[in-house]
Amino acid sequence: MVSVEEIRKAQRAEGPATVMAIGTATPPNCVDQSTYPDYYFRITNSEHMTELKEKFKRMCDKSMIKKRYMYLNEEILKENPSVCAYMAPSLDARQDMVVVEVPKLGKEAATKAIKEWGQPKSKITHLIFCTTSGVDMPGADYQLTKLLGLRPSVKRYMMYQQGCFAGGTVLRLAKDLAENNKGARVLVVCSEITAVTFRGPTDTHLDSLVGQALFGDGAAAVIVGSDPLPVEKPLFQLVWTAQTILPDSEGAIDGHLREVGLTFHLLKDVPGLISKNIEKALVEAFQPLGISDYNSIFWIAHPGGPAILDQVEAKLGLKPEKMEATRHVLSEYGNMSSACVLFILDQMRKKSIENGLGTTGEGLDWGVLFGFGPGLTVETVVLRSVTL
């Protein structure tokens, strides 16, 4: 007779979860940030709001974003005028778009990750799908399973409406799945399309306008598994994870799904709240490893906006190059919500290889990945790089 203990031992992986492959995708429509204010005020029939347009121009100039990718192009917006208004009932039109497009963009990223992984997709045992864009049943996880031709028995997890911290959440969940299920290979997909949040300008809610200056579309996918086979090539180990709600941060970042789409609200002091509490999160994560110099680790931080990165750097005395990969992704893609940190992970390993830096983490062994979002919720992931 086999004991429960023996069964449990046999079910668990030996080693830590590893990221084995990364893929990213964006819609084809690329938007230049320098000309975006003119386009945005024209397409939303708001050109009479000249002062607000100047304010929006300044927001775009300060955003440190060069370009973004958006599914919503001029043609689609002209066909859907309700999406261009500030507060017109438009949820049906938005839902009709994202329910189809979110899994499609996710498929593009997933296909690239599976190709890099190099194993048959029939070996994928679990799927985690995450999006803040739209809600449906059966969900985007089901649609992606069908689009990719995954096994019907794949174990699916659908995460809707999490927000910008969720790139950390999916890695935390994937780590637990991979380490507690021997032989598990988890496909993680974050796919975000701003068709739910796009709306015309108003001078009564400037936080909505901040979102219009920052958000972009993108999807990223990773394969996570423990005990890699010789044919699999791990990129990063997922060593430790945590999630916490910051003190005194209620209402700092909110999103509400309404007839008018997903509305976005934020308090001015989001950068202050994050920078004030970041050291506590780092001590909890790195003290057990004997690390207290945060310039000695590599950094992947969700680029909610330039002010967050600036204040975190200042608070911790980080060298400018620490946030290089993070700022590069912000500059080239904007804030893609949950997908951002996975784009940064991809950027970091690519640059590390290009520059011959010795490890996937800019030549360093240990690193941190931070997700920040509604709550104010912070996800922390401790990463260990792999020798190149």
From Swiss-Prot:
InterPro entries: Chalcone/stilbene_synt_C (IPR012328), Chalcone/stilbene_synt_N (IPR001099), Chalcone/stilbene_synthase_AS (IPR018088), Polyketide_synthase_type-III (IPR011141), Thiolase-like (IPR016039). Its EC number is 2.3.1.74. This is Chalcone synthase 1. The primary product of this enzyme is 4,2',4',6'-tetrahydroxychalcone (also termed naringenin-chalcone or chalcone) which can under specific conditions spontaneously isomerize into naringenin. The lineage of its organism: Eukaryota, Viridiplantae, Streptophyta, Embryophyta, Tracheophyta. Gene3D superfamilies: 3.40.47.10. Keywords: Acyltransferase, Flavonoid biosynthesis, Transferase. GO terms for molecular function: acyltransferase activity, transferring groups other than amino-acyl groups; naringenin-chalcone synthase activity. It comes from the Eukaryota. It comes from Glycine max (Soybean). Pathway: Secondary metabolite biosynthesis; flavonoid biosynthesis. Belongs to the thiolase-like superfamily. Chalcone/stilbene synthases family.
